[in-house]
Amino acid sequence: MSCCGGKCGCGSSCSCGSGCGGCGMYPDLSYSEMTTTETLIVGVAPQKTYFEGSEMGVAAENGCKCGSDCKCDPCTCK
């Protein structure tokens, strides 16, 4: 999955590009409002726990992703 139609890359000083608003690429996953819905499915089979959205990976452009400190990882990506 590419954020902002592929317009999110690494800008100057190894910080994330402005195409996606820096670290705010996923407004619903901001640090101050991060929530997880937990669903327990219990039946005759062994109990398993599933977390909503757990299958979502980290968006990356050309092998580069926005790190937790709003810096590109790795810093050499363009």
UniProtKB/Swiss-Prot annotation:
Signal peptide extent: none
Domain of life according to the entry: Eukaryota
Stored InterPro entries: Metalthion_15p
Keywords: Metal-binding, Metal-thiolate cluster
A single GO molecular function term of this UniProt record: metal ion binding
Pfam families linked: Metallothio_2
Free-text function comment from the UniProt entry: Metallothioneins have a high content of cysteine residues that bind various heavy metals.
Family recorded in the similarity comment: Belongs to the metallothionein superfamily. Type 15 family.
Protein name (record): Metallothionein-like protein type 2
Source organism (scientific name): Actinidia deliciosa
